């Protein structure tokens, strides 16, 4: 499976977790995720983050948000 297919497969679960945790709409969750360092790393093939589980990636995102607060 290529990287973009892998990302497209797990992204919906990541976004659902963010939506549920932060009470956001899908668009808001997508914007928040891709505006974060975690989202940037997820989009970058060189980091390999796309190969991790949705739980791991959403956990990284939520930890990043806690640290920013």
Briefly describe each language-model feature range:
Residues 1-69:
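C-terminal alpha-helical interaction appendages
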